[in-house]
Each structure stands twice: as C-alpha cells, then as structure tokens.
Amino acid sequence: MKKLFTLAMLLVVAIAANAQTKKVSILGDSYSTFKGYIPENYAPFYPDGNNDVKEVEQMWWSLYIQAKGYQLEKNDSWGGTTICGTGYMGMDSSRSSFIARVDSLGSPDIIFVFGGTNDAWAQSPIGEYQYADWTKEDCKSYRPALACLLDTLQKRYPKAELYAILNSELREEINESTREVCKHYNVQLIELHDIEKQNGHPSISGMKSISDQ
C-alpha cells in the first residue's frame, strides 16, 4: 500500500512538473537561426565558418532555455529579415517580414522578438508612430510595422509573456523608436550591450552575454 501511495505521489509530482514547464518561441532574424531548428525554407546564419558558434547548445536561446528548464516551442527566425516590409536595396520584403510570420509560433508561454538589426542595416524607412489602422504601405516603415507587430502578437497570444530584444550598436533612430513603441504596448525591452561579435554576429561569448542579459 505504501509503495502504491509513493508511486502515486511521484506521478503527481511528475505531472505537475511537466505542466509547469514553460514553452518558449522566438521570432527573429539571423542572430537566432540555427540550421535544423528553423523552417527548412528559411535562410540560416549559424553554424558559419567565420564564427565560433558551432553547436546549437551555444545559441543564446538554447542557453536561456537550458538555464530555466524550459522547452523550445517554435523558432521562427529567418536570416536577413526585417520587422518592416522594406528590406535591403529598398526591396519589398513584406512576405518575409516579422509581421508576416506572427502566426507561426505555436502555443508559447514566452515569446522573444529579436529583430530590428536588418531594418537598421538596410536603412529601412523609419516612418511615423502609428498605433492603429495599419496598411501594407504603412508597414513598409519601421515604427508603424513594429507597432503592428506587437499589437498583433498581444492579440494572437494573449496569455504569453512578450519580450523584445534590441541589438547593440544600432543607429539611435532605431533604438529610440523601439523604446517608444515597446513603452506604448507595455512590452519589456531588453537592450543589449557589450555583445562580442564575429562577422557581425554574436560569438560564443556574445551568445552567453545575450542569454545573461
């Protein structure tokens, strides 16, 4: 009888522990890609010959998940993508933009949005602050696109904790715009600093810094 009781208690504990395991999804760009862990048609950066990150366990999100005891739900990260619908050389990137991928995150408890880097590097239009009634044309600029993205994520995943991550060494126009839009939607913004990079992307040391920050 005691053995049965003990087994039952262990089962209850195991079920409770499993129920408490949070699921994490990432909506990102090349900084969060790793071959085999993103959709097959997406362009990965990692692993790369010019960067010392070679194993998925060295990625910032993997380090975070391991440290917290969480599990990966979805990693919808695509190298070279912008939050807005204007990519490099002014090309229309609406189909690969962060906004176009909001429905691909599964059923997460936590969502990390790690973008804006390519918007900065591609010199995408900054636009005006706009918090409703977005058109496709509006979302070709950074400020309205980020607002549309956060608004859509909050409505699509109302129970999820939403965090935005802002890369270091971006132009101040992007930084300030991101702060303002995140403040409007009460989204916690993680502003990175002192991130070691190789070939423009976080190294092993940089990945650890991202995870820790």
Question: Over which residues does each language-model region extend?
Answer:
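Conserved SGNH/GDSL esterase-like catalytic core that processes O-acyl groups on lipids
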Residues: 23-25, 34-127
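Short active-site segment of divalent metal-dependent hydrolases/proteases
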Residues: 31-32, 206
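Sec-dependent signal peptide recognition
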Residues: 2-7
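Active-site environment of divalent metal-dependent phosphoester hydrolases
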Residues: 33-34, 171
